[in-house]
Amino acid sequence: MASTLPTTWPHESVKFEDVSLTFTKEEWAQLDLQQKCLYREIMMENYNNMISVEHHFSKPNVISQLEEAEDCWPMEREIRQDILPECSGPSLDPGMNSFPAESPLMKIKVVEVLTLNKDVAGPRNALIQSLYPESRENLNPGNLKPAKPSKRLTDTEALRQKFRHFQYEESAGPQKAVSRLRKLCHQWLQPNIRSKKQIIELLVFEQFLSALPEKFRVWLESQHPEDCRAAVALLENMTSVTKDDAQLVCSSEATDQLKEKRKDVATLPVTVPPEEPVTFQDVAVGFSQEEWRLLGPVQRTEYHDVMLETLGNLVSVGWEPTLENRAISPDSPIPVVKPIHDPNPKDLSRNGIQSTVFEIISQDRVQEIHTIESNQAGLLQEKSHPQKKLSESSKSQEGTNLHKSQGSLDEVPPRKHVKVKQKGTRKGKDRKNTISMTRGLRIRNQQKDSVEWQGRGDSNPMTHGYSIKNQRGSEQGTAGARRDPITLTVSAQFYQKATGSEEGRFRDNSNAIVPDTPTKIHQKSPEWHKVGRSNNSMSSVQNDQMGSGAGRGRDNTILTHALPVKIHQKGYEEGKVQGNRNSLRHVKAHQKGSKGERVRELSTSEKHVPYIKNHLKTSEREKGRENNDSIKYGPYIKTCYRGSEVRKLRRANNCTKAISRHAQQIFFIKIHKGSQVCRCSECGKMFRNSRYFSVHKKIHTGERPYMCMACGKAFVQSSSLTQHLRIHSGERPFECSECGRTFNDRSAISQHLRTHTGAKPYHCQHCGKAFRQSSHLTRHERTHTGERPYVCSNCGKAFTQSSHLIGHQKTHRIKFKKQPKL
């Protein structure tokens, strides 16, 4: 026997010859049928293991012969073929019948299995050692024990191979062939032992293996899974499957195009002050394209939160970022780490990248996030409006640019621009607000009571759109006040710049995240004061803009989540703001039918944000300042004008808790000690929102302030009255796109759509049964708890449903009518 076993593991890649066994004709003739079958299994397993570790080479001739042959060496006919049914070795040269007196096998004490799988090699070696007695030095046919069928001989895979590889030539006629095939099928499936479900599982498992790619199938067969569940678990846990899937997503052509585009992208310099001990690059973590594809949604979300928290911590200790790194959501495309020139090169990742700029890689383009250098004199101009250049001599200027974020809907048309230009402030300074809006935005001009549409052609889809200019009066009230708001629905990404003193220069908070919250912004005060940046960059963004003119500051704030905004522009009356509606938390942007839009403003009594109130109430005088001089952008953004309030808000927001990215599910998670929580004195329910508590109190007091003028019915909430009025008017604005049915309530069409989709979102915690409506779930849970809330006042009998009680009460009325008259 000529063996090619290496004494030491070579430095180059392993070849099939390094783990294979070869025999000469004389050596082959000395082997019996069982030894030949064992040799075939070992060679096939070694070949499969080499393929499983991604060794690409041509198939050896020995493996081809072993795969093509059906019977195991026909010259050994005296040994029964059913002993080793899975043996299908090659028909070697029939001249190998000689049995020389001396053989190299005589010098081998114990034959070891050469395989890369140690779990398989151990049992095989034990089997070989049991066949060959260790007390004898020579191995000859007389020393071998009688061949006994091992456990593997009766394995399901072996029986399946016999059934699948059955040849018609093995039987004398068709009748015997059918009977033989039926017998093999019974031996494989064993219908007298297995159930129908188990038999079906075997057939599904066989088809699953045949449907797999050859590379995965060969590796899976080498692991010998028992059923489909084990096979699926092996495939899911295999790391190479994930890598192959990641490579399949990016084709070779797309990779070449990506490399060319990445070369064209200009690198951006990072200006880091030499005295700064820590930079963002020191604590940032970068991922390559292949590494990002391997991350799951949960891992991407964690990376997103960690990077935002890291940036917030750096900003809180006084670090001034020079790059506007846009936050990457988990559903965003793959970010690629781009090398840039850094005066202080440091290794940030295992790929040796010195400093990074995040890129958003889409299907056909590479779009790099532009940066804004804070040490330059002017704002970075947008390429879409070259004719609207910002004047360097302007002392006071504010630019607001709202862009569509990654988390918004995909079906939104291209964006539009609406410019609101304000003039005539206290010192004659110009104010500009550039708002990026969606297509089809309707703007109602309150002075002319008409809808104006002004298009502005531009090749850039981010900047072309509508423009409307409104002239505002001076401080003495030269212009009339606008009573009705301009209702907008915008996406949020703000670039703000304000002027102020050099001592209180506002530092940039480039990654403040604002959830999808309806917001009402009141622009009232002609004076812009300046607020220092809060230490908690994750929970709130405070913008303070002062008009002292002693220096220039800049505020560049990016809000990367969709933010519906309603902007109310109100006039002045001798420099004072009319009304105290500036403390509203939010107002929804109503989009209704062709009859127009109706905006219902919330009152200020019980609809303030209860989460910041505790920090701002220290005295009645400061409370008055807050009501007159502050502008609240929802529960997370606040722009105020007093230095004392700024310092107080800094202390209040000095916690490290971060706002949840899904704020529509968790309304507000930052609860400080001493925060006011509303508790109902009647039923004990607790509310963290005073607005919900005020609605709840009306249930106990019986107050129904909203009354229908047609029928006189009263309601607790205005939305209930609006829904009721549709009954009188016959309006059914909600139409099902599937069947065309119309409804007068949004909740009704939501329940109806579940009949088409089959969705059952309400699950019982006791038995797991699902329901389409929450009322059905509540009714079902009473069968588990035994609750019977509906009690008959006549006999005291209780029921689980109100309809059952109504039907029961009818029986009392019938009995009362049947009583004879006295």
Swiss-Prot record:
It is found in: Cytoplasm; Nucleus, Nucleolus. Pfam families: KRAB (PF01352), SCAN (PF02023), zf-C2H2 (PF00096). The keyword Transcription applies. Its main location: cytoplasm. InterPro entries: KRAB (IPR001909), KRAB_dom_sf (IPR036051), SCAN_dom (IPR003309), SCAN_sf (IPR038269), Znf_C2H2_sf (IPR036236), Znf_C2H2_type (IPR013087). GO terms for biological process: chromatin remodeling; extrinsic apoptotic signaling pathway; neuron apoptotic process; regulation of JNK cascade; regulation of transcription by RNA polymerase II; retinal cell apoptotic process. Residues 399-408, 468-477, 533-546 have a biased composition (Polar residues). Residues 14-85, 278-358 form the KRAB domain. Residues 376-481, 499-550 are annotated as: Disordered. GO terms for cellular component: cytoplasm; nucleolus; nucleus. It comes from the Eukaryota. Keywords: Apoptosis, Cytoplasm, DNA-binding, Isopeptide bond, Metal-binding, Nucleus, Repeat, Repressor, Transcription, Transcription regulation, Ubl conjugation, Zinc, Zinc-finger. Residues 160-242 form the SCAN box domain. Transcription regulator which may participate in NGFR/p75(NTR)-mediated apoptosis. Probably acts as a transcription repressor: specifically binds to the 3'-end of zinc-finger coding genes and recruiting chromatin-modifying proteins such as SETDB1 and TRIM28/KAP1, leading to transcription repression. Belongs to the krueppel C2H2-type zinc-finger protein family. This is Neurotrophin receptor-interacting factor 1. It comes from Rattus norvegicus.
